[in-house]
A protein has these predicted regions:
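N-terminal flexible/basic segments that precede or flank functional cores
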Residues: 2-55, 115-122
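Short, residue-level hotspots on alpha-helical faces of the histone-fold
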Residues: 34, 38, 58, 97-101
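Residue at a beta-strand N-cap/secondary-structure junction
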Residues: 63, 89-92
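DNA major-groove recognition helix of helix-turn-helix/homeodomain DNA-binding modules
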Residues: 92-109
Length: 123
């Protein structure tokens, strides 16, 4: 069917779930902190360390990628990949530098869970 002259066909763009999550991690500071806080809360469970590293990798992807992170932290890109990869074993100092460079320091992430927990008990 031809469109009347001057009218444009409407197209609907839908994002995948992953794209939507990346957009929220990029644009919404509170969401990014909550996302990492949930992963941190589950770190002692089976697979929890890997889940936390996945959450960090997703935030890195959303906020400019590993090359950008390397520039902002002064850490070598290959070392970042190795540390934060599945099964990686990053030093605490690496995690702290990475989170700080991403704009969500560890203290924000850790204290957020404490704030959420106290709100639940207050209700």
């Amino acid at each position: 069917m031809e469109m009347p002259q001057g009218e444009k066909e409407m197209t609907t763009h839908t994002q995948s779930h992953d794209e939507s999550v990346l957009d929220m991690l990029r644009e919404d500071e509170a969401f990014a902190i909550e996302y990492l806080s949930v992963a941190l809360e589950e770190i002692d469970e089976d697979g929890g360390e890997d889940a936390f590293l996945i959450a960090i990798r997703r935030l890195i992807e959303a906020r400019g990628g590993m090359g950008n992170l390397s520039k902002n932290t002064g850490l070598a890109r290959p070392n970042l990949y190795r540390s934060i990869a599945a099964g990686g074993d990053p030093k605490l100092s690496t995690i702290l530098k990475v989170l700080q460079a991403l704009g969500v320091g560890m203290s924000k992430v850790a204290s957020h869970r404490a704030d959420v927990g106290s709100q639940r008990t207050d209700q």
